[in-house]
Design a protein with these regions (language model features):
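Internal glycine-rich, Lys/Arg-flanked active-site/core loops of soluble domains
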Residues: 13-97, 102, 107, 111-112
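Short glycine- and Lys/Arg-enriched binding-loop motifs that mark or flank ligand-binding interfaces
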Residues: 4, 48, 67, 83, ...
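N-terminal targeting pre-sequences for secretion and organelle import
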Residues: 116-240
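Single conserved hydrophobic/aromatic residue that forms the stacking wall/gate
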Residues: 1-8, 12, 239-248
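A generic structural micro-feature
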Residues: 2, 81-83, 101-103, 201, ...
Length: 248
């Protein structure tokens, strides 16, 4: 797929075999012209550039963008082989609070620019991710005891609350210990420490392609001046075509 930006092009390759739902949907939208004249509406330096909001077509300079959709989502298609190194294409989505299944937006996507990380930084990130997983287990257990917690709070039973907290924390640790710990692969460590990326997104957003030509176009968009909503002040349109079907 080719993306034009003021007559400058980049070439994107889909991961056809591994992410078929995202592949088929992306091709469908490109063929239907859904992306034509849409904007790169969200740009964050050392992170990513985002596009695909249908509402960005002919949008005013003050319009708040990023909420447009095509009326459906796509089930997540996570694959450990594909991670958020610089240049990959991934599906945007709503947050975990309203989207615990991590389903992808039906149309919005982003291209990672990211930054480089040292190995100690990546190790610290691994630890943080594992801590967050344990916290999520604790929160899930706590929700199962909400009535009990409410009664204790109403009665001012602080000792009972602390005892229950200790019990739930122990249960969460036990459950976490049974799960495989998150670890970056040697390939991820090499990529994130040399070309860079956004490792904190791994396993949470579906990666389904990458830029194979014209990364300088992405780099130029990334450094564009933006407003307080991260929207570029200078307009960058997208125009996607299908000159060639790529396969891996």
């Amino acid at each position: 797929h080719r993306v034009d930006r003021r007559q400058r092009q980049m070439c994107i390759r889909d991961r056809y075999n591994e992410t078929p739902k995202h592949r088929d949907n992306f091709i469908k939208l490109v063929k239907e012209g859904v992306y034509d004249s849409t904007l790169f509406h969200r740009v964050i330096k050392q992170f990513m550039i985002q596009a695909g909001d249908p509402d960005s077509k002919n949008a005013s300079d003050t319009a708040m963008l990023g909420s447009g959709d095509v009326g459906y989502t796509i089930p997540a298609e996570f694959n450990p082989k594909f991670f958020h190194k610089k240049g990959v294409l991934a599906a945007a989505r709503q947050g975990d609070d309203v989207n615990p299944e991590k389903a992808s937006s039906g149309c919005q996507f982003y291209i990672v620019t990211g930054r480089k990380f040292t190995e100690p930084q990546l190790l610290g990130m691994e630890n943080k991710i594992n801590e967050q997983r344990e916290e999520a287990l604790f929160d899930s257990l706590a929700r199962q005891h909400m009535k009990e917690i409410y009664k204790m709070r109403k009665a001012g039973d602080n000792a009972g609350l602390l005892e229950l907290q200790d019990t739930l924390e122990a249960q969460a640790r036990e459950l976490a210990d049974k799960e495989e710990k998150f670890r970056f692969t040697p390939e991820q460590i090499k990529a994130y420490s040399t070309i860079g990326g956004a490792p904190h997104l791994d396993g949470s957003y579906t990666v389904f392609g990458e830029v194979t030509e014209g990364m300088e176009v992405v780099d130029n968009i990334e450094i564009a001046k933006t407003n307080r909503a991260d929207r570029p002040i200078a307009v960058s349109y997208t125009h996607l075509t299908l000159p060639t079907i790529y396969s891996v």
